[in-house]
Amino acid sequence: CSHYGRTPPCVDALVAAAPARVVIAMGDPNPQVNGQGLARLRAAGIAVTAGVLLDDALALNIGFIARMHRGTPWMWLKMASSLDGRSALPNGVSQWITGPDARADGHHWRARSCAVLTGIGTVLADDPQMNVRAVSTPRQPRKILLVSRFEVPLDARLLDGAPTWIFTAREDAAKAAVLADRGIVVTCLPDAAGKVDLTAMMQWLGRHEINEVHAEAGEKLNGSLLRTGCVDELLLYLAPMLLGEGAAMAKLPVLTQLDQAQRYRYTDVRQLGDDLRVRAQVEARWQSLRKAVEVAA
């Protein structure tokens, strides 16, 4: 760091300490820094070795790197399903497809995020709290609710607890005023179809310093997030059962050729109790961020 933020530049302390060598994992893509700290170290005669454990450092800081490099947070989409890709029975019953270990792991990922995002369909169907309960955490992530027509129940449990942002496509000044009195921020971002503009929302979140978003919704919103390119990573929990007919994980358009499919790379597969957790990232997104920190280093 070579600029004044919440604290003075740490490069000043390093130069004053005069070590023979400094080892770093990656550069800082923040335009206020962008290699200036490394240049100052080298100008002071300090040897610098960069790129050590680069991939580990990128994984640890991926949300910040994404926001600095492209202006939007890193989003992972959490979905739980049967082996045949069903997230609920035809009557809507989904509790619980996965076991307690998988559900606790999902709360770990909520805790890691800056914000937990869901849609009004999930709120109306399940009235979830969307907070962290199954693991300990020093703070609750912010909550984000997407609701096109502003049909927000004022007694929804999601509105309690951690700070909440609501994105809508339709103004309702009276309801917005009631929510504002509870500290809830409402932002209207309509697209041409009368839905919430998801691309504009991601840019808005980036401007408000949200690094990582944990999305956990129903098949319609999941599909919309995937179709618009908001999702960088999939967090899939697979239960060892077959459900047959029922809700899909995501509502996606019909493809006619295999080369139209979005490709992912597996980054981790592990067993949690009786279930499997699969992590998969959009390869091009990861490589773009990796290149950004390599260049900065």
Q: How would you name each of these model-derived features?
A:
Residues 2-56, 142, 160, 165, ...:
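Zn2+-dependent cytidine deaminase-like catalytic core
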Residues 38, 52-82:
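Proteins enriched for Cys/Gly/acidic motifs involved in redox and nucleic-acid/cofactor modification
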Residues 4, 18-19, 66-72, 184-187:
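Short secondary-structure boundary segments
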